[in-house]
Curated annotation (Swiss-Prot):
Region annotated Disordered, chain positions: 76-139
Keyword vocabulary terms for this entry: Acetylation, DNA-binding, Isopeptide bond, Metal-binding, Nucleus, Phosphoprotein, Transcription, Transcription regulation, Ubl conjugation, Zinc, Zinc-finger
One Pfam family per UniProt: Med26
Gene of this entry: TCEA1
Domain TFIIS N-terminal: 3-80
Transmembrane intervals: none
GO biological process, one term: transcription elongation by RNA polymerase II
Zinc finger (TFIIS-type): 259-299
NCBIfam families listed in its UniProt record: TFSII
Cross-link Glycyl lysine isopeptide (Lys-Gly) (interchain with G-Cter in ubiquitin) residue location(s): 55
Primary residence: nucleus
One Gene Ontology cellular component: transcription factor TFIID complex
Quaternary structure and partners: Interacts with EAF2. Associates with UBR5 and forms a transcription regulatory complex made of CDK9, Pol II, UBR5 and TCEA1/TFIIS. Part of TBP-based Pol II pre-initiation complex (PIC), in which Pol II core assembles with general transcription factors and other specific initiation factors including GTF2E1, GTF2E2, GTF2F1, GTF2F2, TCEA1, ERCC2, ERCC3, GTF2H2, GTF2H3, GTF2H4, GTF2H5, GTF2A1, GTF2A2, GTF2B and TBP; this large multi-subunit PIC complex mediates DNA unwinding and targets Pol II core to the transcription start site where the first phosphodiester bond forms.
Name listed for the protein in its UniProt record: Transcription elongation factor A protein 1
Amino acid sequence: MEDEVIRIAKKMDKMVQKKNAAGALDLLKELKNIPMTLELLQSTRIGMSVNAIRKQSTDEEVTSLAKSLIKSWKKLLDGPSTDKDSEEKKKDTAVTSQNSPEAREESSSSGNMSSRKDETNARDTYVSSFPRAPSTSDSVRLKCREMLAAALRTGDDYIAIGADEEELGSQIEEAIYQEIRNTDMKYKNRVRSRISNLKDAKNPNLRKNVLCGNIPPDLFARMTAEEMASDELKEMRKNLTKEAIREHQMAKTGGTQTDLFTCGKCKKKNCTYTQVQTRSADEPMTTFVVCNECGNRWKFC
């Protein structure tokens, strides 16, 4: 049964990626006939696939059946209720799914799952392991939340992942505000740097890690530019640092005095040079030159 659900989930994920939901209704009908369990929901993450289809489809029958399935599966996550007002709770699933102890316990107990859960209200299934961000009436903060959510929508990764980008954007903003406690320039610069890095086409993994919960909102709110940088940029910075250290060491080891080189700064020929094999053995050596008159340094291969 698990293999069957995984097969359906994979087909739905491909539909979302290709933005073509043809055949989604048949898959949803298959799911309706499968007796779902909590273990099956967690191991297959089918709820996220169904929710992604629901968000993308314009077919009313597809969205209606998807909502119905999600609503029935949410009851498995909530567990049996003994509250006398359970009927009222059912009318307000958005509130109970976020605040019930059962939902929070399930969120913290599934260590190998991401912070999203296969539970939903009529809007989405993404529920963070962090408390929902408190609402605010501050116009600056609201605008920043909107811009962060828009940055998280870059590349449409949030659809395939099934993340609630608006709630996630609010949580990131809330974490920034709680640290700075003001909406001054420091706050705005912090928000801008998050937005810039989330939109970076050369660093899609950062955005995906934030969306899927590998990087929690409060951690992302505090990350430095170096920590948010792409692997390519980190490697470049590492190499530049090594090069700077090597040049500094070369300057200390002395060298050979010569008048063969002309300083581009003071135009004099009183120089000292050192040759070092900085690349592979079959490539030319790098020559480091220091002007003994003005201290100007340069290198060439």
